[in-house]
């Protein structure tokens, strides 16, 4: 008789809620284990089957650690601000707050139906005023330390889209908005910026101490992009007071620099452009106004540029270098100016070839190297480089930097690809930035004791049309007057969705504290997060921003650790049956509600963990889900009869038949669960069930141990079996089983039998067999006798536990 999953799962979910089974104590008498998921954005679509994969993995670890005696913190919350809710509100006229609350209710129902052991008493929501009070507080501390500042930033401005709004680089295609095809222009706009670059070195160096996938660490290192090189100053010919600074990682190639390229927005362009070239330069600048940074730096696009009419002076060679502007150089990267070495850089070579600029080789190539045809980008000895001739790369770099420093023409420089974090959004549905701009030009923070600065209700969410957020339309909220009659305006930009997720792991520790982010003693106990699981799509930005804020709070003395997440695991993607990514447009999205209703939550949990390694992407299989359900029925029938009672085979007597396989299973499953090899652990549990079906009696102690072993993976059926085994208390805190190492010792060993040095047979003998017994058994082996027939055995060499070598002729 199959187990009735609907009844059993509802029963135990109700039990857990009614008994507050998974509410975490802040008592510090036990070792702690803090395990969490990347909290979801509560979309209108609800959960898909990809969500439970990571959630099941963290739940298995949480349940395992509870049974091993740890005090486990396993929370859940909602990353609920963001553009989708605002777009939905604009489209439908619904309030994003109501829409978000409805979505959260649905998400929570779905998550609860899967039996995850979250401590819901610690639930957080980034849109709650009591939560974003502290998001605003962190911003204010950043501002006080000079790490939050205003700046004019080039943005993608679409004046005809949604009444006039800023769009992201990814939303611009061929100079038009992805949605609607409206023209986009690059314009400078006032933005709030966070100085993440102040932490760039620490963000790279501290990765070494983290138990993270190497691929994720490397992505972060590349994003931060630390490089060592030199800043070089190029005087402008005929303009004694003007020098152009260039950052290069290859100062050793300065003798090969034949021209310079500035970003069209570079501050020096207007000053150095000659009257003859002014019209061409202006036309070029206007032509590239609508291009996003992504389009401008696309390696596949044709290089474009215009000569300014000016020349820079190469500080090493004294030669004049024509100064061009080109859109592939960005003002936001480095100094916004490059020295071009076309003989040894493919992009520079392409530009030089197109505009017939000189190419000078300074690195010795192969015999067939022709720098007129292509750049030579490998290493080699330096040539045509004066005092650097004959030097290798590193020696020449050091020599070039020494020369530049000695002649005040440059200096050693560490540079970063990382740019400061543009922190403001021209949107309504986000945390208000707690700043007031006064009529006398002063900017002040909202006093801390007046936080949170609440997001006001708004009926109209259309953009202001000025580039400001819809909050600019709310005069009563925007306009303020201080006690002296001074007039001011509130900041109308809001924070990005990244803000709330940059510190939420701290709030779980003490979610109702209204005096601080969290109690310092609780933070000291719980931090860092021991295990953090989520998708690799957050490998860079979320994790980088969270690490930045955490390090800042560490410097303030608010948190006790330098890093927030000690171990990180990225679960793989669950694909459609045809190995394609699940999406609504492809019609291959699978709703977990349907699986839970038909097969049960335990079946879904078991299947997703058995599909393959956690980190791997794998296709959904209907047969696989059916197979997982069949195995659970098999587990049920092993212990429970058709009358829903414990089988008579379950006995207090142990005849020893399962000793070895049980102890092997406890050892293997424990090790595999701790290493998060969930599919391997499940395979061993299946082996145990197969063996258990072969024996006459099932010792109670082994059946209890087995039910404990399956409980982190399939908790509902485990709770029911635990109850039927005679226990009144939940299995959630039952002591994790241990194994008897003596039972794992093999009683029989296999020996290799050689005749005249060649392997002829394999022999199984008792582990404690004597040499005489082993010799007799080897000589009696039929295969050995074939190879000794008609020969005289001269000698038998026995190496206990390994081999027998028979010498015969």
UniProtKB/Swiss-Prot annotation:
Keywords: Aminoacyl-tRNA synthetase, ATP-binding, Cytoplasm, Ligase, Nucleotide-binding, Protein biosynthesis. Its EC number is 6.1.1.4. It is found in: Cytoplasm. A motif ('HIGH' region) lies at residues 40-51. It comes from the Bacteria. It is an enzyme of class 6 (ligase). The keyword Aminoacyl-tRNA synthetase applies. Coiled coil: none annotated. It holds the Pfam family tRNA-synt_1. GO terms for molecular function: aminoacyl-tRNA deacylase activity; ATP binding; leucine-tRNA ligase activity. InterPro entries: aa-tRNA-synth_I_CS, aa-tRNA-synth_Ia, Leu-tRNA-ligase, Leu_tRNA-synth_edit, M/V/L/I-tRNA-synth_anticd-bd, Methionyl/Leucyl_tRNA_Synth, Rossmann-like_a/b/a_fold, tRNAsynth_Ia_anticodon-bd. One of its GO terms (biological process) is leucyl-tRNA aminoacylation. GO terms for cellular component: cytosol. Belongs to the class-I aminoacyl-tRNA synthetase family. This is Leucine--tRNA ligase.
């Amino acid at each position: 008789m199959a187990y009735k999953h609907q009844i059993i799962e509802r029963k135990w979910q109700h039990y857990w809620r009614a008994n507050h089974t998974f509410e975490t104590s802040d008592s510090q008498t036990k070792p702690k284990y803090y395990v969490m998921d990347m909290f979801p954005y509560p979309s209108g679509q609800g959960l898909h089957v990809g969500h439970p994969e990571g959630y099941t993995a963290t739940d298995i670890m949480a349940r395992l650690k509870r049974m091993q005696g740890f005090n486990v913190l396993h929370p859940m919350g909602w990353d609920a601000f963001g553009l989708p809710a605002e777009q939905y509100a604009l489209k439908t006229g619904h309030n994003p707050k109501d829409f978000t609350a409805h979505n959260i209710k649905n998400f929570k129902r779905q998550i609860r139906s899967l039996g995850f052991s979250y401590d819901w008493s610690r639930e957080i929501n980034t849109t709650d005023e009591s939560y974003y009070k502290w998001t605003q507080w962190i911003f204010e501390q950043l501002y006080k330390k000079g790490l939050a500042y205003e700046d004019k930033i080039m943005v993608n401005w679409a004046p005809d889209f949604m009444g006039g709004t800023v769009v992201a680089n990814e939303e611009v295609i061929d100079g038009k908005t992805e949605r609607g095809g409206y023209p986009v222009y690059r314009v400078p706009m006032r933005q709030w910026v966070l100085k993440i670059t102040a932490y760039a070195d620490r963000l790279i160096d501290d990765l070494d101490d983290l138990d993270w996938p190497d691929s994720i660490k490397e992505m972060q290192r590349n994003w931060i992009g630390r490089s060592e090189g030199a800043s070089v100053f190029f005087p402008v010919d005929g303009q004694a007071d003007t020098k152009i600074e260039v950052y290069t990682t290859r100062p050793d190639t300065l003798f090969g620099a034949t021209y310079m390229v500035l970003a069209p927005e570079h501050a020096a362009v207007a000053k150095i452009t000659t009257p003859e070239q002014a019209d061409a330069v202006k036309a070029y600048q206007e032509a590239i106004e609508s291009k996003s940074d992504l389009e401008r730096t696309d390696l596949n696009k044709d290089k474009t540029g215009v000569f300014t009419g000016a020349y820079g002076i190469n500080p090493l060679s004294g030669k004049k270098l024509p100064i061009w502007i080109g859109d592939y150089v960005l003002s936001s990267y480095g100094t916004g100016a490059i020295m071009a070495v076309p003989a040894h850089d493919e992009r520079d070579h392409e530009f030089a070839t197109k505009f017939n600029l000189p190419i000078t080789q300074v690195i010795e190539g192969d015999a067939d190297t022709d720098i007129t045809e292509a750049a030579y980008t490998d290493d080699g000895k330096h040539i045509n480089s004066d005092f650097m001739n004959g030097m290798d790369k590193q020696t020449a770099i050091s020599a070039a930097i020494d020369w530049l420093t000695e002649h005040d023409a440059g200096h050693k420089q560490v540079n970063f690809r990382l740019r400061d974090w543009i922190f403001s959004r021209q949107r309504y549905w986000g945390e208000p930035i707690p700043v007031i701009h006064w009529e006398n030009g002063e900017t002040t923070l909202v006093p801390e004791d007046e936080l949170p600065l609440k997001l006001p209700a708004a009926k109209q969410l259309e953009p202001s049309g000025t580039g400001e957020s819809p909050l600019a339309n709310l005069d009563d909220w925007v306009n303020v007057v201080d006690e002296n009659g001074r007039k001011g305006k509130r900041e109308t930009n809001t924070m990005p969705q990244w803000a709330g997720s940059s510190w939420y792991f701290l709030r779980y520790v003490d979610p109702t504290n209204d005096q601080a982010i969290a109690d310092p003693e609780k933070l000291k106990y719980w931090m860092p997060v021991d295990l953090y699981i989520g998708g690799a799509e957050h490998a860079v930005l979320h994790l980088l921003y969270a690490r930045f804020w955490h390090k800042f709070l560490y410097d303030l003395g608010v948190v006790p650790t330098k890093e927030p997440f000690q171990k990180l695991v990225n679960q793989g993607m669950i694909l459609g049956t045809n190995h394609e990514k699940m999406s609504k447009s492809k019609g291959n999205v699978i709703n977990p509600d349907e699986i839970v209703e038909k097969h049960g939550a335990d079946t879904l949990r078991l299947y997703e963990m058995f599909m393959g390694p956690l980190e791997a992407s794998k296709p959904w299989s209907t047969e696989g889900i059916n197979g997982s359900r069949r195995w659970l029925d098999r587990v049920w029938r092993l212990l429970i009869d058709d009358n829903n009672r414990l089988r008579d085979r379950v006995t207090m007597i142990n005849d020893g038949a399962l000793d070895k396989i049980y102890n092997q299973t406890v050892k293997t499953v424990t090790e595999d669960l701790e290493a998060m090899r969930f599919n391997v652990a499940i395979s061993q549990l299946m082996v145990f069930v197969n063996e258990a079906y072969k024996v006459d009696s099932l010792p109670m102690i082994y059946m209890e141990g087995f039910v404990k072993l399956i409980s982190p993976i399939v908790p509902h059926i485990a709770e029911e079996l635990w109850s039927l085994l005679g226990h009144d208390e939940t299995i959630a805190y039952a002591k994790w089983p241990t194994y008897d190492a003596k039972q794992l010792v093999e009683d029989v060993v296999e020996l290799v039998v050689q005749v005249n040095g060649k392997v002829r047979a394999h022999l199984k003998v008792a582990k404690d067999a004597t040499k005489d017994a082993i010799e007799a058994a080897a000589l009696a082996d039929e295969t050995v006798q074939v190879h000794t027939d008609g020969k005289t055995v001269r000698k038998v060499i026995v190496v206990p536990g390994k081999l027998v070598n028979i010498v015969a002729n």
